[in-house]
Every structure is written in C-alpha cells, then in structure tokens.
Regions:
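Hydrophobic alpha-helical transmembrane segments of multi-pass inner membrane proteins, especially
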Residues: 63-293, 332, 336-390, 417, ...
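Transmembrane alpha-helices of multi-pass inner-membrane enzymes
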Residues: 393-434
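Alpha-helical transmembrane segments
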Residues: 18-25, 81-83
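Hydrophobic transmembrane alpha-helical segments in integral membrane proteins
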Residues: 1-17
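TM-adjacent membrane-interface loops and short helices in multi-pass inner/ER membrane proteins
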Residues: 287-331, 340-342
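Membrane-interface helix-loop junction between the first two transmembrane segments
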Residues: 22-39
Length: 504
C-alpha cells in the first residue's frame, strides 16, 4: 500500500508543479485584476497540496515525528508570510511572493529528505532572515538617502571581500567564508548586493565615460579580490552584474563587448594558474574517466538518469550518495526523486522569477532603482545558470548554490534580502503609478470644471459652425487655444506608461 501511494504521489507532484509553473507565466501577462487574484489563490493551494503530499509520503516511508514538525513549520512560514505581506504590504508583488514560497517549499522538502537536521537549521536561518528583511521594503520605499551612499557601498563591499581573503578558510579550493564563534559567514553574498547599489548610485545621473571608468575600477577591485581568493564562480556573478548594469546605463554595446573579451582572457589565465580550475575542467570533459579526481559530477548525472521523467519517488532513490547533495548538487537530488520534468519546471520557475524582476526594472521611472533591479536580477539568473549548468555538465562546476533551494545560511539570507529589495522597488513603482493616476484624474476634473456649460449643450454641428466663424476672425487666438488644449507629449507618455504599469 505504501509503495502504491509513493508511486502515485510522484505523478501528482509533477502535475502540481507543471500547473504552478504555467500559472506563474500566466500571471505575468494577465491584466485583469480579478483573474490574476484567482491565479494567485490557485497557486497558494498548489503549494499547500505539494507540501502535504511530499511530507505525508516521507512520513509513511520513515515514520519520523521530525517530518511532521518540518511540515508544520513550513506551513506556518508560508501562511504567515502570505498573511503578513497582504496586511502590511498590500501593493507588493504577490507573484514574486508565490514563486519564493514554492522555491522554499522545494528546498524544505528535499532537505528534509536528505537531512532533517540541515532542514531544521535552514528553516531557522530562513525565519530569522525573513524577520530581519521584513522592514527592507519600507526602507527602499522611504529611504531617499540610499542613493547618496555610493562610495560607502564600494568601501563596504571591498572591506568584506578583503576580510575573507585574509582570514577566511579554504573550502573546495577557494576561500569562501569566515567563522566567528562557530558561525560561518560568506560575506561575498552581501558584497554582491552592495556592488549593485554602488554602480546604480554612480551611474544614476551621469553615465559619462569618467563615471564608467570609476565604476569599472571598483568592480575590477571586487573581482580581483575574489580571484585572489580563488572564488571564481562568485567573481563571474559579480562580472555579469557589472556588464549588464553598464550596458543598461549607457546603452553602448562596446562596454560589455570589451568586458566579455577581458573575461574570456581571464578564464584562460585562471585555467593555468589554479589547479582546482583545471580539475573542474577535466571533470567537465570526462566525469567518468576522472573518477579519481572527484565523483561528484558522475554521481549527480547517474542520479538524474536513474530518476527518469517522473523520478523514483521520495525515499526510493539514493541522492544521499551524491557528494554535497544539499548544496552544489541539490538539483540532481531533486531530479532523481522528483523527476526530470519536475526539474525542468523548476528551471522555468526560476526563469519566471527572473523575468518578473526584469519587468519591475523596466517599469521603474528613476534610473537608480531601475539599475538596482536589473543588477540584482542578473545576479539571480547567473547563479541559477551556473548551478544548474554545472550539475548537468553544460559548463564546468563553479561551486555556486541554487538560490532559495540549496542549503546555506549566507546564500539564503542574501537571496531573501534581494527579493525584499525587489518588493520595495515594486511597491515604490505602484506608489508612483497611483500618484500619476491621481494627477491625471485631477487634471480631467479641472478641465471639466473650466468648460462653459453652454458648450456641453451645444450640438456637434453647431459647435463646428461656430468654430469656423470664430476661426476666420481670430485665427491666431484659436491656434494658441488649440495648442494649449493639446496635452504635453512627455506627460502623455508618462500617463500611458502608468496605465500599462497598473494593468501589469
């Protein structure tokens, strides 16, 4: 009986994931408020059903009380966040919130399957991060001072990376973090956010060549410190954020092209300088033949293949034998027991989140906020690409974790912080839209108030005849009046953008 339930559950889980992913993209393009509300409600029901089915199956398989505890804690978090956001931040993006809850649900499910202790540790970090970051949307919305701290962001980011380079301990061939009183901190996760804020502040008003050079020098210092720490995966994330922000700010293709050329040359140099980079390239070329170097990639590929399209079912596979399955290779563990179709939907869900962030960036009227959203979205997409691309042998492994899914406190905190900033930007854009809508309605009311009452009663043909007669006598005055009645082109465009934004 238990085996039948397990086998049926994997098809139901796959179906729920497919429906949630499709609904996520549908909500992005849906303009009707009521229909989008129904989509969001259906998504919440799917999240609850998926958690219930997965944790129920795991309890049937193991019979551990800790599984029930993790289910209750996960449900308390998801429902609590949904309720609090709707009470406090009514203008927040519920699409982004639902995507975050689904990704966190997948994380809690697979971590509970692999290690209940790590799942509990991850949950504590998640809860603390959410509480700490709950005020971030207010700071972004009201904090006009954020755009004036440009060089503080630069100094703070360089200082954090320098501390790790000097005092950090080596893991996987790279200096990634420092340890204080038994607690590990990966400061590069915070530095990638401060770098984006620095570049946005530097280029928010003046995107001249001089400011581009300043931004390039500071970004290069960040990247060079990471290279010296042999943390090349994070260095690539920083570099991609730099390239995209520079291009969006200047609209000049030569800057990213020069940057990509320099990065290509740096990759070649890194290959000859660092032995762990050569080992990862060798594993990428032949994971089976280089089993003596590491079995991570080969075990991950075996796990995904053994799961097939629908997976083996929870506790029916062996993802626990994959090295670092809770971190770098968590995507392989998910595909093994939940299926390749589930994994494809996970990729599409991450893509939906990225598109949503980019859409928010495009709707921002102020360049500072636009560049922040664009930079953070680029970092998120780059992390997803590096993690999944490395585990499926598309690119060499980089040691980057999957945001919101992989085990890791610093990564979890920085991602929750990043999404809280994005929510603040979305709320700010909604405020701007409402303000412009009020101005437009006020303008219409004033125009209606200033129109003579006789003009409303006059028939169209009489009005036309009257304008013809008056036009011949006072053509200049009529022309000036007509010019005054024409709306300003800039204001018309702003109103049009506001209307589209409100629909979106």
């Amino acid at each position: 009986m238990e085996n039948t339930i397990v086998q049926l559950s994997k098809y139901v889980i796959t179906f729920l994931m497919i429906c949630f992913t499709v609904q996520s993209f549908a909500a992005l393009k849906e303009r009707d408020e009521d229909e989008r509300h129904y989509i969001l409600m259906r998504q919440i029901i799917m999240i609850i059903l998926m958690n219930f089915i997965c944790f129920f199956v795991m309890f049937l398989q193991e019979g551990e009380v800790s599984t029930i505890q993790m289910f209750l804690l996960t449900m308390a978090y998801i429902l609590g966040v949904q309720i609090l956001y709707r009470l406090i931040y009514r203008k927040a993006s519920m699409i982004l919130l639902n995507n975050m809850c689904m990704l966190l649900s997948i994380s809690m499910i697979i971590l509970t399957r692999l290690s209940v202790s790590k799942a509990m540790s991850q949950y504590k970090i998640l809860a603390a991060s959410t509480l700490l970051c709950f005020i971030i949307p207010v700071i972004v919305r009201k904090g006009k001072f954020l755009k004036n701290l440009t060089w503080i962001y630069a100094v703070l980011g360089i200082a954090m990376l320098s501390v790790v380079m000097v005092l950090g301990f080596t893991s996987g061939g790279a200096k990634l973090s420092i340890e204080i009183h038994g607690i590990t901190f990966q400061l590069s996760e915070i530095a990638k956010i401060t770098l984006v804020f620095f570049m946005a502040g530097m280029l928010r008003e003046d995107n001249s060549f001089g400011n581009v050079v300043k931004a390039t020098v500071v970004a290069a210092v960040h990247v060079l410190i990471l290279v010296a720490s042999t943390d090349l995966g994070t260095a690539f994330v920083f570099f991609m954020a730099y390239v995209v922000v520079i291009y969006v700010a200047t609209r000049k293709a030569r800057y990213p092209l020069l940057g990509l050329a320099g990065m290509s040359a740096a990759c070649v140099v890194a290959y000859f300088l660092f032995s762990h980079v050569r080992n990862r390239v060798a594993l990428w070329q032949d994971p089976i033949g280089n089993w003596d170097i590491s079995s991570q990639l080969a075990q991950g590929l075996f796990g995904m293949c053994s799961g097939g399209w629908f997976g083996t079912g929870l506790f029916e596979g062996r993802p626990d034998i994959i090295p670092v399955a809770t971190k770098d290779f968590i995507f392989c563990a998910i595909c093994e027991e939940m299926g390749i179709i589930f994994g494809i939907c996970l990729i599409l869900l991450c893509m939906s989140t990225f598109l949503l962030i980019i859409n928010i960036s495009m709707k921002m009227s102020k360049r500072f906020y636009k560049l922040i959203a664009m930079g953070l979205g680029t970092e998120y997409a780059t992390q997803v690409f590096l993690t999944i691309g490395g585990t499926i042998k598309f690119i060499p492994m980089t040691g980057i974790t999957l945001p919101l899914v992989s085990y890791g406190g610093s990564s979890m905190f920085s991602t929750v912080l990043m999404l809280s900033i994005i929510q603040g930007l979305y709320i700010l854009r909604e405020d701007e839209g409402e303000e412009l809508e009020k101005r437009r309605n006020k303008k219409k009311r004033n125009q209606q108030k200033n129109d003579p009452g006789a003009k409303k009663k006059r028939r169209p043909d009489e009005e036309t005849e009257r304008r013809k007669k008056s036009g011949s006598r006072n053509d200049g005055q009529g022309t000036r009046q007509k010019y005054r009645e024409q709306p300003d082109e800039f204001e018309r465009r702003i109103e049009e953008q506001t209307e589209n934004s409100l629909h979106w």
